[in-house]
Swiss-Prot record:
Lineage: Eukaryota, Metazoa, Chordata, Craniata, Vertebrata
Organism, scientific name: Homo sapiens
Gene3D superfamilies, A to Z: Mannose-Binding Protein A, subunit A
Name recorded for this polypeptide: Putative C-type lectin domain family 20 member A
Domain C-type lectin intervals: 26-131, 159-275
Source superkingdom: Eukaryota
Amino acid sequence: MLPRALLLSFCAAALQLVSSKRDLVLVKEALSWYDAQQHCRLHYTDLADLQPSGLWKLYSLMTSTPAWIGLFFDASTSGLRWSSGSTFTALEWGQKLPEFGVGFCATLYTWLKLPSIGAASCTAQKPFLCYCDPDVGHLISTKPSLSLTTSPKPAVVQISGQTFMRFDQVMTWSSALLYCRSHHTDLADLQMVTDETGKEALRSIMSETEAWIGLYLNANSGSLSWSSDLGASIPSWLQVPMMVRGLCTALGIYMTYSPKVYSVNCSSLLPFFCFYDSSTGHRASAELPPLFHTSPTEMTEETTPRPGRAVASVGSGTDRRDTAAATEAQHLSSESKEKTSAQKSGHPFGILKADFTISTLMDPEEMKDQFLRQIQEVLKLTLGHEQFRLKWVSFEVNKK
């Protein structure tokens, strides 16, 4: 334990709201949850919890921007826990908690001037709230085992001397990139997957749930690039959708058809593919890819991309199938404005029509969830953070 005089000194330096010996501070630097916890334990005491005696001080520091607090999903107990060791109980203001799972931590923000708890991937970069207690001091030397995630057990295959692995833990594209670079080489670069043997090996670790790969639209050059910087060739079987800034690529498979590339909002939470190349090694210090027309340090996970187009298509030799050619976001937006608005239970709604080209062997009703996901990604680029819900009504066959 540090001398009390020293403890009082370090707390006084962080003091923003003084009323009792337990004080709170908002740190605006964006860090992952774990890095935020380490920062709080080094400079203060720990990430903030929601003790009733300190709620009024927390409230005065809160903003509409979500900030990390000490609450996280403990994978070892499959429940919520405070990083300080306190037992989690119901919230003072009676809010229904969002759904938490492995790899998710809690944020605190204001919504309509009321405090709200949010859930986000623990790897996301966010500001955070620390508390300072002079009777406890720094906790940097006290490192309890926090099971934010279960030990990753990826599906692994070897292709052309490279190791590919699929992780089911969900992250944003940027967070997955940083994870892959720190522990392996990078997000999956498929330039070496050129023959049927390689494709079949890759298929063995794929699923219908799309997972991030390293292909993205370089905002500086306007061309497709691999985040690994090992080249720019794209295998002929890898049919890439139309891309715009703010969209990244994910790989999935439907039934027995060829692997399909999806364009997805880069801030979405998806599983991901990493690869390891022994001749390259880790790339933890590599420069971040230019997803937007900003410097790498300005690229955040909260950036709202510009309107664009999302298209998904796949193919393999003569077995090519163009699927889910999603409509352009700007077209959808302008067309929806021409539709007659109506009110139902106080909520406005509009009717959108999207054209898709699929094989006659595929049932559109079975694929409606995939279609809706792609339309949703396009609308997110147009509507930003506005809340909306999509409902599948029907489909019709274009006989032209």
